[in-house]
């Protein structure tokens, strides 16, 4: 929010969702959005691409009838999306402020961006919290490679766990290594196709980012 703002609009939580290309960031957004809406949360979505708005178009198609397409905005960065969410987030800050102005009753904005390998982080001027997404197909050694995105993220998502047997990856090893490099910071294993771990991820977002009471599993309306 602009420091000079004196209006009474509520603070809309900004959540960055980053990770390597192909890790499943867009898929994560597509599966958690209907659950958030079902639980009474009003989301907005911003995606980042270099020279297109293809991710935004994909999300609009997938969430048609679930989320008004005007609440999904694509940003063409013209350069590495990594730069546009960390070193110079001005384009994304402008996009966020535009969405906040248009939809002031929203509860959260998800800002999706790819980045270089494991180095992507979000400027605190842009995101209040951020989720980093990796996938099993990258190999079980990925957590051991550290990287600021993987280590510092508020939540680490290890996605596409169904692919583990096909790429020779051990989920036990990945979990063990994740605990070593992240310490007490939370992580979760997910499968967007089956929904495994997705409700739990939404629980974490609501509890840790939105500070909303979360019902025990199985009690969601």
From Swiss-Prot:
The keyword Nucleotide-binding applies. It is found in: Cytoplasm. Signal peptide: none annotated. GO terms for biological process: urea catabolic process. Belongs to the SIMIBI class G3E GTPase family. UreG subfamily. Facilitates the functional incorporation of the urease nickel metallocenter. This process requires GTP hydrolysis, probably effectuated by UreG. This is Urease accessory protein UreG. It comes from Yersinia enterocolitica serotype O:8 / biotype 1B (strain NCTC 13174 / 8081). The gene is ureG.
């Amino acid at each position: 929010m602009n420091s000079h703002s004196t209006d009474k609009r509520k603070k809309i939580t900004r959540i960055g969702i980053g990770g390597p290309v192909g890790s499943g960031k867009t898929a994560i957004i597509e599966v958690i959005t209907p659950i958030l809406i079902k639980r009474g949360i009003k989301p907005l979505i911003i995606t980042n691409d270099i020279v297109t708005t293809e991710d935004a178009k994909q999300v609009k198609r997938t969430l048609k009838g679930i989320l008004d397409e005007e609440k999904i905005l694509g940003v063409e960065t013209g350069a590495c999306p990594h730069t546009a969410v960390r070193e110079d987030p001005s384009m994304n800050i402008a996009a966020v402020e535009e969405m906040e102005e248009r939809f002031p009753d929203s509860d959260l904005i998800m800002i999706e961006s790819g980045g270089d390998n494991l180095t992507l982080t979000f400027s605190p001027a842009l995101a209040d919290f951020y989720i980093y997404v990796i996938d099993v197909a990258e190999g079980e050694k990925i957590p051991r490679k550290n990287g600021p995105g993987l280590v510092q993220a508020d939540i680490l998502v290890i996605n596409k766990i169904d692919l583990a047997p096909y790429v020779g990856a051990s989920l036990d090893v990945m979990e063990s290594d994740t605990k070593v490099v992240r310490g007490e910071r939370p992580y979760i294993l997910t499968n967007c196709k089956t929904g495994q771990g997705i409700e739990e991820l939404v629980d974490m977002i609501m509890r840790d980012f939105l500070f909303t009471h979360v019902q025990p599993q199985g009690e969601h309306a």
